[in-house]
């Protein structure tokens, strides 16, 4: 559920988009989560204005408009403009969307739907269409939170109840903010991959694979007053210097930026920057089904063999936050007893390796997606940092389009450099995907963990920080002590925009692979 959302508790092969959207803001940036492009006045709004939004479509879109067929969670940033979910996510809460309210117990959830909401073709959103949407999206292997829904009861046309097969209401609630909870018109399902019927603020106008996705305003949308754009053009911009150039030349009006481009973008006089803190983090996942990482003592040693602060400074220009544990300090999952314990101590790591029966060190292969400066630079630094501790790491680059099959299905590599996306208030969500039997990554990498699973299962019953916090603090401490993952950097969400063209209050989304289009507009003239 991450991203607030869903179950994608792992974020499927989202193709890692080279961190192209989130990594930037340090403490100075985090002072404000929004940036005022200009005061919103009716006289300055161009109701036909089209926002040109830069995105790497080649690496972050699944080439289908059917959420049930998506294999890349980064498609969410486009899908969320086309489809409303039942709920929406903030960093610490879930909020109404197509459901105006809900009541829940650990094993059931009842949603009250928004009266009068329709799809773009005029069909109403009802309990029947919600059930059909869930049944359709549930067929995806990536939407595993939906497998918790045992049965669905249509109480009346605007009320629907989910009965769950486990006490995991918190997890399912978050799933309802994400791809899992997106609402599709069952009458349009046969053509949804190419001609979707929208339940969101925009409809599809045209699509050129790898080039552009053009959307226009959905004039039947229930909350159309919140959206002042005539449309949105998602246009292809590859990560790297092209992002800076696209902003500078006006080829795009808005885009997420990479860490290495922050200084150049900030120097542009007509560009504004908006930031939002996020739980997104860069992480090394290890394959624990075989040597060397089937030994928890080897994994534990590696926690002291990486210089998180050094990576933050060298790769992220000091703008991220070193991840000494899986949860940032501003969340209920942060464990004060762990704190910043796992600093770079290569001599200690080497001694731990020797004590585990490896006096001459261990060798392993780290897989990274090709074509990403951020991942490439991070991997090279990791290679140098790990060597004094006795970890001999080789780097293998794989095309982003092949990562999913090569690494997770075919078992290539001993570890992979990837990214976990925010799950908003559902702190347990990523751990569910990584370490429980239901999680895709946990199954494919052999990382299921019998010690962590009971803590995760208990936490999934509720989104309350008082429930999840103590459990995930304990789980995080265990994860670090046994090296179940190697968190590296927390990455705030950052978007840049053309101040001459974009008006309203620009708010960066709560994490990568998202877009926030409400309240902004294109200026007249």
Language-model-detected regions and their locations in the chain:
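Detector for C-terminal structural segments
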Residues: 208, 306-333, 374-383, 408-525
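Ligand/substrate-recognition segments at binding pockets and active sites
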Residues: 354-422, 465
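Gly/Pro-rich hinge or "lid" segments in bacterial periplasmic/extracellular proteins
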Residues: 72, 92, 176-226, 231-233
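Structural transition elements
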Residues: 321-355, 372-375
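Alpha-helical secondary-structure segments
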Residues: 52, 126-132, 157-163, 200-201, ...
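N-terminal lobe/hinge region of extracytoplasmic solute-binding protein
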Residues: 54-106, 197-198
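Ligand-site clamp/hinge motif
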Residues: 220-265, 392
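Surface-exposed binding/hinge segments that line
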Residues: 46, 103, 108-110, 144-186, ...
